[in-house]
Amino acid sequence: MILPKGKARVGSLLADRTEAGSDGSGMLYGFDYSCGLQATLAICDGFVRAVRLHGSTTGSSIFPARNEPASIPETALVPSNASARVSAMPQNGLRVLVTGASGPIGAALLPSLKASGYQVTRFVRGQPSSEGQIQWDPSQPIAAELVSGFDAAIHLAGETIVGRWTDDKRARVRDSRTLGTRHLAQALAHAKKPPRVFISGSAIGFYGDRGDEILREDSAPGQGFLADVCQEWEAAARPAKDAGIRTANLRTGLVLSADGGALPKMLPPFKFGLGGRLGSGRQWWSWIHVQDLVGAMHHIMKSDLIEGPVNGVAPGPVTNGEFTKTLGSVLSRPTIFPVPEFALALALGRDASKELLLSSQRVEPALLVASGYPFHYSELKKALQAILR
């Protein structure tokens, strides 16, 4: 591929920033064994109710060890002077379409967009209850005129993965993502006035269970139900890309927020000193503070050359054991009650417990770092302190 003038591969830019000493700055659980297995399963169920596919299984430096050079697909390009080449896209009056805005990510995103001067329109499943809402059914095609005239579209909608993974449940999880994304992407592609950028949700579940391997945007997909769904999810956004719309697939990690998601569900047992690691605790968890995830979306909208897969994680992944100890430290509580794998399997089923809680994904936000996104929270302890204190 011939690189346009003024552009450089992310891999090259990342190497430049690393040599300069840049650090890229500038699910969970709770189990109470004292109450027996029934309480354990109940708490586990509470945790899973906090996890959605777009943010489920999912420091100081980008990673504790860097034994391999960063390399990013040629389709993911950023300018060699990234900070100076962020587009001066005027924000006041820009129209943004958002789906899936009722979750903790959307709850943080919407006020942020409005505070920045964007005009926000939401696609909602139920009857519209206020101005700026449009009813839609993700399983049905969307009229192109409904999505015409927007400057950006952010697609976060998808069926929750709560519950055991029966065949019917798997189908709903898959179809809500692939059909909804495909129908939206096709409508955007045929719109008379299509958006300049389409940010479509995905998840680091794309990578599967990878042990200690460092995972970047160009890493191969993994195996398993979630990995398969994520691959189909990203492919479903292709009609927008093929129509010339800049399309980014935001592979979100574990989102930390005080207003929803996994963290509030896991706090009660930890506050009582009953928290502990899951299984061996050696599995890597790649997390991100919700403020940084929202900031990353703003960054993608403004940075004209960011496209393709984008890892929505902080540059400081930790093992589950480290996460457990850090949370206990922030709460000033012990973390001495580990949860065995069999308890997770009893609560969720073997496949769901393995993919949601025990899979290891050590993910690096190579593209966000290389394109100059200034993370507010690169260290887990500071992120948890900001949320909990």
Each PLM stretch: what is its role?
Residues P79, S83-P90, L94, E355-R389:
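C-terminal amphipathic/interface module of NAD(P)-dependent oxidoreductases
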Residues A88-P90, S303-D351, Q385-R389:
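Mid/C-terminal beta-alpha module of Rossmann-like enzyme folds, strongest
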Residues V96-A115:
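N-terminal Rossmann NAD(P)H-binding glycine-rich loop of SDR-like oxidoreductase domains
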Residues P128, G132-G180:
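NAD(P)H-binding glycine-rich loop region in Rossmannoid oxidoreductase-like domains
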Residues R182-G224:
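Conserved Rossmann-fold NAD(P)-dependent oxidoreductase catalytic core, especially the SDR/UDP-sugar
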Residues S202, A235-A258:
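Conserved beta-loop-beta element that borders a ligand/cofactor-binding pocket
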Residues Q231, A243-I245, L256-K265, I300-V310:
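Glycine/proline-rich active-site loop of Rossmann-fold NAD(P)-dependent oxidoreductases
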Residues L267-G275, Q283-P317:
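Alpha-helical substrate-binding/gating segment
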